[in-house]
């Protein structure tokens, strides 16, 4: 299990038998290397442009093409879960970039006219289907640490809201304006 710093361990306050409580505050985990750009430009869909550029160059070097896709901004209602995603971002970047990047958690407070655009991420079904997915394993550990049984979800039959409530998976299918984002960690 990941060593989530104490200041982000909010599952004890959010997690119930029904899953993670949802309110108007969202979190996004990423690398500290991206914070200065996010502070100026917000969180852009398709994520890490530098990492995408490196992937495109690598594919060109080996004679293959790379088609960049536009992905939404992935969110969660838990700082603890966002930290897990931030660790993944740092690990992904460490393969291609040198430096001392750290996981950071960003808080997102959307204006009223944008709040209803946050949707449950049913694309997470792939993680549920794959035995041994590390995020699902970490999530199981969080449930266990809080004395709650991990939900037995059938990804084909699960209600959309289960992906949000039980797995903490949501998305926002547009860029998040900079004025809506604050840094929770450094």
What is each model feature region?
Residues 2-5, 29-31, 50, 92-186:
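Active-site and NAD+-binding cores of ADP-ribose-processing enzymes
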Residues 64-84:
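Short, well-structured hydrophobic secondary-structure segments
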Residues 36-37, 83-85, 117-118:
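Short helix/loop capping segments that flank catalytic or ligand/cofactor-binding pockets
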Residues 1-70:
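ADP-ribose/NAD+-binding catalytic cleft of ART/PARP-like enzymes
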Residues 79-95:
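Short active-site loop/helix that positions an aromatic residue
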Residues 26-28, 74-76, 107:
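A structural signal for short, well-ordered beta-strand segments and their strand-loop junctions
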Residues 16-18, 75, 161-162:
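Alpha-helical interaction segments
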